[in-house]
Regions:
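GST-like domain detector, emphasizing the conserved glutathione-binding G-site
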Residues: 1-103, 109, 114-116
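Short, solvent-exposed turn/loop segments enriched in Gly/Ser/Thr/Pro and often Arg
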Residues: 19, 125, 171
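GST-like fold's C-terminal all-alpha helical module
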Residues: 71, 79-162, 167
């Protein structure tokens, strides 16, 4: 998710893949970046940040998408939080998937019926957050979006982007 957004932004970065099985995320060097021992995390100069949603919003504010109004900022934050707190668990927690998915994807399908991206005609960090979870659902749990054609088209549209192919599509 974060790597995809960095590619979309064209921001130079160093990607470090931790060997989770070997416990690299629990070593003091990484714990100094993220004391929760989770990925992703970034280091930008002396600034360290963890949690994908926080990182996405930080990158948007720093490199591209700082909206003019509080309302626009809040709408972006709404979608990033929805992706991490609601959509992700609804798609990936098996005990919730069957019950939650229709309640999540039906309105999302309606929203995407009339526009190519969540906030209109241009890809935004909101699409990176939501689109990542949708793409991973297709890749990791073989989720079929056939009942949600606008969502299926959205996932296809995102997956055709070069930055997506370079990152999520390459896994």
């Amino acid at each position: 998710m974060v790597q995809w957004y960095l590619e979309e932004l064209g921001v130079p970065y160093e990607y470090i893949l931790l060997d989770m099985k070997a416990g690299e995320h629990k070593q003091p060097e990484y714990l100094s970046i993220n004391p929760m021992a989770k990925v992703p995390a970034i280091v930008d100069g002396d600034f360290k940040l963890w949690e994908s949603g926080a990182i996405l919003v930080y990158l948007a504010n720093k490199y591209e998408e700082t909206p003019i109004s509080l309302e626009e900022q809040s709408e972006i934050l709404q979608w990033v939080l929805f992706a991490n707190a609601t959509l992700g668990p609804g798609l990936f927690l098996e005990d919730k998937r069957e019950k939650e998915t229709p309640h999540l994807l039906k309105p999302l399908n309606e929203i995407l019926t009339n526009k190519p991206f969540l906030l209109g005609d241009k890809l935004s960090v909101a699409d990176i957050a939501v689109g990542s979870y949708l793409a991973y659902a297709k890749i990791l749990v073989n989720f079929d979006f056939k009942e949600y054609p606008a969502v299926a088209d959205y996932v296809m549209r995102l997956s055709e982007r070069p930055a997506f192919k370079e990152t999520i599509g390459n896994r």
